[in-house]
């Protein structure tokens, strides 16, 4: 019937929902967090590195943020076209996604919190 059965190593998130997963974690600068992602019919290990504290200015205001850089656990590019992602979450209890940046070999997409 075309159905496949896959073993799932615990909780698995899609590439977008991992941002919301991170919002509920006690994130510490310099620490790394591991989770599994389901994307393009594959389950992949993703390592999320908390790399910096930065002040980010967007239309919604100025925020103290944690800079988060997810990488693939297998060393392969995380996104299509050799893409990389960076996420800036507000460094407070809300953990708002203030800025998300995706770079690929065809360009860069930047999303910023408006209000």
Identify the function of each model-found stretch:
Residues 1-29:
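Contiguous hydrophobic, core-forming segments of folded domains
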Residues 24-115:
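Acidic, serine/threonine-rich low-complexity disordered tracts
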């Amino acid at each position: 019937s075309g159905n496949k059965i896959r073993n799932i190593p615990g909780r698995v998130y899609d590439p977008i929902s991992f941002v919301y997963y991170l919002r509920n974690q006690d994130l510490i600068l310099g620490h790394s967090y591991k989770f599994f992602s389901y994307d393009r019919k594959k389950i992949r290990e993703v390592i999320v590195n908390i790399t910096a504290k930065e002040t980010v200015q967007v239309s919604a205001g100025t925020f103290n943020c944690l800079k988060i850089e997810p990488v693939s656990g297998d060393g392969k590019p995380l996104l299509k076209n050799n893409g990389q992602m960076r996420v800036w979450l507000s460094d407070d209890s809300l953990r708002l996604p203030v800025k998300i940046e995706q770079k690929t070999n065809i360009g860069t997409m930047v999303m910023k919190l408006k209000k």
